[in-house]
């Protein structure tokens, strides 16, 4: 059991969880406001 807790506290797992949460937030934001993420240069 302590091997599982040691695995869950490693950096790659935390980075993947953070990236998953960030991607989910961006996807939901882009679904409700699709034109705010990509501004035209003109």
UniProtKB/Swiss-Prot annotation:
Pfam families according to UniProt: PSI_PsaJ
GO terms of biological process kind: photosynthesis
Transmembrane segments: 7-27
Residues annotated as signal peptide: none
Keyword Oxidoreductase belongs to the record: no
Location in or out of the cell: Cellular thylakoid membrane
Top-level taxon: Bacteria
Key words of the record: Membrane, Photosynthesis, Photosystem I, Thylakoid, Transmembrane, Transmembrane helix
Main location: membrane
A GO cellular component entry from the record: plasma membrane-derived thylakoid membrane
Membrane topology, record value: Single-pass membrane protein
Cysteines joined through disulfide linkages: none
Family: Belongs to the PsaJ family.
HAMAP family, sorted: PSI_PsaJ
Record function comment: May help in the organization of the PsaE and PsaF subunits.
Protein name as catalogued: Photosystem I reaction center subunit IX
Organism annotation: Crocosphaera subtropica (strain ATCC 51142 / BH68)
């Amino acid at each position: 059991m302590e091997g599982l807790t040691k695995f869950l506290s490693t950096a790659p797992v935390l980075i993947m969880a953070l990236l998953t949460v960030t991607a989910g937030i961006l996807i939901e934001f882009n679904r409700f406001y699709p034109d705010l993420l990509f501004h035209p240069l003109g």
